[in-house]
Amino acid sequence: MSTTANPLLAEINKGTDLKHAETQDKSAPIIENVPIKKNDHSSLLGEVEKGAQLKHVETQDRSAPVTEGATVKSNNHSALLGEIKSKAQE
C-alpha cells in the first residue's frame, strides 16, 4: 500500500510549517551584580582527607524485646478435653 493512497499518511508526510520562535538566554543570574565564584575542589578534598574530630558517645541498646513481667499461664489442656468429652456423651 503506498502512502499516496491513504490521505492521512499523505498529510503526515507533507509535514507542517513551524512558526519562528525567539529564545531567551536564561543562563545569567537573575539578581544583578552577583559574583559567581568557582568551586575550589582541592580545598574541599583537603578538608575531607584531614578528617573530623568525633566525640565519644554512649549508646543504649534497646533492640531486645521487653519481656519483664510477662508470664506464661498454665495450660489445663486435659481438663478442657475432659469437659468436651463429658458434654459430648450427654
Curated annotation (Swiss-Prot):
PROSITE patterns: WH2 (PS51082). The keyword Glycosyltransferase does not apply. Residues 4-21, 40-57 form the WH2 domain. InterPro entries: Actobindin, WH2_dom. GO terms for molecular function: actin binding. Pfam families: WH2 (PF02205). This is Actobindin-B/C. The gene is abnB.
